[in-house]
Amino acid sequence: MSYPLFLITWEFKSLSCHKHKEIAYKNKLRLKLSQFIFSCMLRKNDESAVNEESLMSKEIVIVGAGFAGMWTALSAARLAKLKKADDISVVVIAPVAELRVRPRFYESKVQTLVSPLMPVFEAMGVKFITGNVTHIESEKQLVVYVDENQNLVTKHYDRLVLAAGSNLRRDMVKGIAEHAFDLDQIDTAAVLEQHLNGLASKPSSQARNTVVVCGGGFTGIEIATELPARLKALLGESEPVRVIIIERNGQIGTNYSQELQDVIKQATDDLEIEWILNAQIEEITAHGLRLCSGEEIQSDTVIWTAGVKANDLTNVFAKQQGPQGRLHVESSLKVVDQSNIFATGDVAYAATDDKGNHALMSCQHAILMGKFAGHNVAASLLDCDYLPYKQENYVTCLDLGSWGAVFTEGWDQKVKSVKEDAKKIKIAITNELIYPPKAELDLIMEQADPLAPWV
């Protein structure tokens, strides 16, 4: 639906004379303006979207440059090279051409936890567009993105791969957006790190020395177990620090095996981390938080780690959405009921085996899913057979701060290693294994093969 531009402009001017009108109304007008511009762009591109260049080549457009997006691009380019298909172009659209190593965002010096992608993209002939995709028009085979100059641009695709990742939910409890820190993106993790580094300049108090972690899942446990040593280093060994994990379930690590739960409990006990179980948070404030039980905890640092959802672009395909907004996909990772759109990584709800297990929102699954998605999206243009995505092996490697780590194998999470031995495995995974390969053609071709050995 489009709106007359003069009417929208008049409404904006009218608002300047009526300051008492709600800000929400002005936001609605911005949305109308965006929709109007978008509809104009679609009409303009309806006849000309397939330009002279695209008539000569077929374009695979990948939205996102995380673990799944990177490997999708490299794998698609790999198959095109193997088939000598010079008419296939692989294009990645993302805000920045770097892999941001999200599994390490609980660590210090977070802004260094990135790896450039242009070397590997250039080695494989992958094109990169700096932009943030805001709309998908599947019937017209168009994506709309905001470029680095804040212009709206349309891009035609022959095949589209959604690899846009996931985001933390900030609407679950009052006060999250205003008062809580998080590790969701590198920028927000950097804000938390800056805040922690600044605590030493504040007078010693119970609130200053107390950190509350909301959510006792993987991310919550890793940041909580990291904090005691970090706080002592920042505030002084003699300062009494307190780290609390708020968990809504009645036991530690509800979704983990009993064996893994026992290790987590031992580690957090040894680190003197407190758990508050069966707890619901009513509100996060500038001075801490209040539980639904009425208990208040004074803290200058509340970290939110609970609740993740797939990128909002999945809302375009509402009929295909499953748990956490992820898209139901076939074994090829093609979105159900979509002829030329694939999904991978956090946005895809994909079966890993025939036993009822599904890929988690983790780099472990995103990396291999990306390789399969890339192969299959290229195969769909080359009239090659699909490779059905399977990932029967599953491991868990949970960092437990200065205590060490724990490493498990299988969906039943049998503990195989703990403490320092597990820590070495964790470091090898997060500091080496998950990073992009060296920008060497033969090496990339080998590692981008979805059937190459992986975890």
For each of these PLM feature ranges, what is it?
Residues 350-392, 397:
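A conserved FAD-binding loop/helix module that cradles the flavin
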Residues 42, 50-58, 126-210, 303:
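FAD-binding core/adjacent interface of flavoenzyme oxidoreductases
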Residues 53-130, 222-255, 303:
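Beta1-alpha1 glycine-rich phosphate/pyrophosphate-binding loop at the start
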Residues 194-240:
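Rossmann-like NAD(P)H-binding beta-loop-alpha module
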